[in-house]
């Protein structure tokens, strides 16, 4: 049984895939890992490249599936994983050199921990690597029975990005947490919110896990036409959070903390939708009207004057007028 299972969802990344896979294969140390490439119905040469790489390089497994989105592809990889520990990597990014060697040391030093969290570097279009300004990670263990405290620690360490996690597979199986297939954007955060209910000990490592490529055109993060998909994902995540509250998995305090975190995801997207073209605003509006009453505030909204003004306009004049007014600026 391998020590690590590295899950890489693949979709239309023919220009980046080889570099991503080789960043795993070229890790120094024993071949105590498996790398699972999940081709999510790519329409370019990515699927064929997966097969060619698996034929050429050791340790690779390839799964081809119909297109279902990043969350569904990660779930497919989880189902196939056999390693003791799980790592995730996006197919346009790269694993940091020497990561697995550093993780072997961390796992041996902290055998009682189920969830390790590291850092990343931003991979700029010109090839340079820069630290992410939003990271405020304090290395070391963090334990608390207070869900809100655990959530704050995770959020402060750089939000929720599974490609800088190392998670014990048996812990994840016992928690029975999976990615939400209907959440086609930012699928990490509902996964994290739910998994955090089952884990009262985190370990923050001052270790770079990933070189995260920024500014790639056509991604869900950079393409404006994907804004409606983001709101559909937010609505799906909200339904999941409501079920966790209804079935008692999340108590009242935990649910309130989840909603506060969800607000910090919702409000920036609502503000972004306000300044896009009319068709995008029209597609986003039903989701904004549905979700806005659930998120009266968020920490980001409370700390910036423009967010407070935008929130006041939404509450006073309603989404339609606010989106129209923002589009006229």
Predicted regions and their residues:
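Short aromatic/hydrophobic "clamp" motif used to bind/position activated sugar donors
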Residues: 86
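Catalytic core of nucleotide-sugar-dependent glycosyltransferases
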Residues: 207-216, 222-252, 268-269, 274-295
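Donor-binding/catalytic cores of nucleotide-activated saccharide
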Residues: 70, 91-202, 210-228
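Short, well-formed alpha-helical segments that are part of the catalytic scaffolds
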Residues: 13-26
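A conserved acidic beta->alpha catalytic loop
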Residues: 23, 39-49, 66
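Short beta-strand/loop segment that forms part of the nucleotide-sugar
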Residues: 32-41, 61-66, 91
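Glycine-rich, basic loop-to-helix element that forms the pyrophosphate-binding segment
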Residues: 65-81
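Membrane-interface aromatic/basic loop that binds lipid-linked glycans or pyrophosphate carriers
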Residues: 274-329
């Amino acid at each position: 049984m391998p020590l690590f299972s590295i899950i890489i969802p693949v979709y239309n990344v023919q220009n980046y895939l080889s570099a991503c896979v080789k960043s795993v294969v070229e890790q120094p140390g024993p071949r105590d890992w498996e790398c699972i490439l999940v081709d999510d119905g790519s329409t370019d040469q990515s699927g064929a490249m997966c097969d060619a790489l698996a034929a050429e390089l050791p340790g690779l497994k390839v799964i081809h599936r119909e297109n279902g989105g990043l969350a569904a592809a990660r779930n497919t990889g989880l189902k196939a994983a056999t390693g003791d520990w799980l790592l995730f990597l996006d197919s346009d990014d790269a694993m940091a050199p020497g990561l697995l060697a550093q993780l072997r040391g961390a796992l041996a030093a902290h055998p009682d921990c189920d969830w390790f969290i590291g850092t990343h570097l931003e991979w700029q279009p010109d090839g340079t690597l820069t630290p992410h300004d939003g990271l405020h990670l304090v290395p070391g263990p963090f334990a608390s029975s207070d869900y809100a405290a655990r959530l704050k620690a995770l959020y402060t360490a750089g939000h929720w990005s599974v490609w800088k996690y190392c998670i014990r597979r048996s812990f994840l199986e016992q928690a029975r947490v999976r990615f939400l297939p209907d959440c086609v954007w930012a699928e990490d955060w509902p996964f994290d919110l739910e998994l955090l209910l089952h884990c009262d000990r985190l370990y923050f490592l001052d270790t770079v896990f990933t070189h995260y490529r920024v500014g790639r055109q056509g991604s869900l993060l950079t393409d404006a036409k994907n804004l409606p998909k983001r709101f559909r994902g937010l609505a799906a995540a909200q339904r999941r959070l409501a079920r966790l509250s209804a079935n008692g998995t999340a108590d009242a305090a935990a649910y309130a903390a989840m909603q506060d975190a969800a607000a910090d995801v919702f409000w920036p997207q609502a503000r972004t939708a306000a300044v896009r073209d009319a068709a995008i605003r029209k597609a986003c509006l039903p989701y904004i009207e549905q979700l806005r009453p659930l998120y009266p505030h968020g920490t980001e909204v409370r700390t910036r004057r423009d967010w407070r003004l935008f929130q006041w306009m939404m509450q006073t004049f309603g989404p339609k007028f606010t989106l129209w007014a923002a589009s006229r600026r």
